[in-house]
Structure formats: C-alpha cells, structure tokens
Amino acid sequence: MKKKIFYWSPCLNPVGTVKSTLNSAISAMKFGKDKYDVTLINAFGEWDEHSDFLKKNNIKIINFNYKLYKYLPKKGFFQSRISYLIIYFVCFIPLLRLIKTLKPDYFIAHLITSLPLTIMNLSKFNTKFILRISG
C-alpha cells in the first residue's frame, strides 16, 4: 500500500518556496512512484496557476474551494499578517477534517506552519509531521 504524503504550502507571493515545494513533490513522485501518493493542498487558490503542471506530474490536488488568493493583501508586514490570520481561521476546520478523514502518513508543512502545528498538537494523529523551512 502506498504511503500518503500531503504538502501544505500556502504562499502569498511567488517566493522560492513555491519552486521548493514543486520540486519536493515531483521528486517524491518520481523516485517513489511505487511507494508514495503525493497530494498538494490548495488552501485558498494559491496553486491554481500550477494545476496543469501538477497534474502532468501525477500530483493530486485537494482544493478547499476558497478562491481568496486574488483578494488577500500580499504587500507589507501588517497586511500580510492579516492575510495569514484569515488563512489560519478559514482553513482550520477544513484542514482538521482532511487530516482526520484521509489520514496521511506524512504531512509536510512549508509556510503558515502555525495552523498544522496547532492541529497536530491538539489532536492525536498517527501522521508524521515534517516542518520544512526553505530559503
């Protein structure tokens, strides 16, 4: 049975983490295609422009169907923190349900890691949590 890997990388700006996340997910599929089932969580539409590329590389996408990406403030320290808070509260229940129902073996968090950290600490999941820091 394949192990499930979920990627959580909600990014506001096209920073290096986008490329890092894509490369990591593609590598997991390429070198572990018989061992791993790779899924990227599209929390608020931030991965929409990469959907064709992800499908071409056999990476599944789970959409939370919040198309907020265009509307969230991205520039400035305080404005981006407001966006992070919105993402945290809007995605809390969907992410909790997702982990509870689909039970990934590995959960790799790249950005806005406070949300998955909170969920993993509040609940008893068998999921291995990997905090990935890039850049």
Model-predicted regions and their roles:
Residues 7-15, 19, 27-82:
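N-terminal strand-loop element at the rim of the active site
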Residues 47-48, 114-118:
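Short, well-ordered alpha-helical microsegments
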Residues 106-108, 122-135:
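Active-site proximal beta-strand in glycosyltransferases
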